Amino acid sequence: MNLIRHSALALAATTALLAGCATAPAPKEPVTLRVVAFNDLHGHLQTAALNLPHPNPASTAANPAPPLRVNVGGTAELAGLVKELRKGAPHSVVVSSGDAIGGTPLISAIFFHEATIDVMNRIGVDVAALGNHEFDAGAAELQRVLAGGCRPAQPGDTAMSCALGRHEGAKFPHLAANVLKADGTPLMAPAVVKTYGGIKVGFIGAVTRGTPTIVVPSGVAGLRFTDEAAAINAEAARLQAQGVQAIVATIHEGGFNDAAQMEWNSNACPGRRGEIFEIEKRLAPAVDVVLSAHTHQGYACVMDGTSKGRPVMQALSFGRGVSVLDLVLDPATGDVDRSKSVYRNLPVFNARTEAAHRELIIGQEPAPLATALRAAVPDADVAQRVAAYTEKAKPLADRVVGRIGGGFDTAANRGSSSAGRLIADAQHAATMAADRGGARFALMNPGGVRAPLPCRGTPPCEVTFGDVFTMQPFGNSLVVMTLTGAEIKQMLEDQQRAGRTNPSFLLPSKSLSYRWIAKAPYGQRVQDLRIDGQPVDPAAAIRFTVNSFMADGGDGLSLLRQGRERLGGELDIDALVSFLKTTPSPSADERVVIVND
């Protein structure tokens, strides 16, 4: 294991911060720096059935038409677009805004995410922020993956380290200004300084301070996550003291643009909401750009509505798009001239993209970006590397493990999704026997459902291990515990958290049902709570199942840490594989009835 090289990257970044870069003649003309950013790759290396919504030109107020679904994605295609965008810019930088690894399809997880780091090196990533999912396997494993070297084999491993030769680690620094070790020192370099045409530019990284509530506790043991804005502002002040005026913050936190969800290049963002916009309000004026992530949305908001406003960007997820920022650096001040800078989100076209969709979008872009979109082809080196990993994973990925009577999707419909209900039913089935815990119901967290389970062809459709793993990749175990009926009701009441507009509904098995009264005060929203059709006695001791992430208080479910008479069970993916042998079909049963009146 080589932890030295990645530490050296961090040390070099910090040294650059403190010492500044070698003095260079000040440029006489403005310097344009092209920033190409992507976020939340989540190990989606292959070209798959991914899409982005785009406004339908045939839609009118009188005759609205559904949005276009534009096929996009794939890291070979992403690398090809990056290459074309860099061709058109003498000065450029590629940034990843976190969650490149963790919560991934099998092709990344089966190689301990070394495949994703390998591909990012080949794409040419220059700077990355940490995301919450980088901590899924703990800080020590994160540092190993970034530094390089082979992971020692463990009993029962199905994953492979150094599958295509020695893992070289990341050839770019990972930044986290707000993640501190127990002794108060930073886990990673907080920032890095790079020079373009004689002008220094600082890049500061941060991750959502809510990471400890959405990552298994063992993954963040001994770490402290501080306020994002405060950490970035402190780092920006240090950068300015070193003569760095142009500052880019890459923050693994995000938001939404509710009023124009498909208008990912609208600068106005009238319906914007979410944590990143609250953070932006508290950032020092010295920060010129905010590259965001985490919510898998697309937006290009300019915050004060003027040409001098600060942009806040995000480019969806899974390599479906990139944010492109042409930052004009003023030679007199060394700062970003926001009035002359350009901010756009671009799709990553692939072979599945319809020609009409491609031409429609290209026609809406300024000439230099349109040229890059039209010229981009899949990068051969990345394509070959992904193919090699795919072939290595094929024996396990292609193994048929069950059948389904129809497709299960992740779209939330009145607080639930068919994919989430499937997983909850599988976990209940695995633990309802007395000798397996005697669970009366099961609950699944929506964030743990990572992908739909498609039915390809005529039902019953075969399901492979790769399909199941992509849907549920975290490797949690099942935990049966006891709470009283009153405690269970309180846990469900807590789905609506203070400061949040909408509740985050847990996904129940079919044995649990209730009504959610949206406009009722806290403590009165959950009504008619039933198990197997019978009202729940508040005083009764009730056994139920959750995954180990939830049982440890993940997703803010602190009450579950009080669960009594715990019994550990099998892995969540094993429970799902067993359930698929019954050929389940999607059900339309309403387990949670939402009343908005």
Please annotate each region the language model reported.
Residues 1-10:
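Bacterial N-terminal signal peptides that target proteins for export
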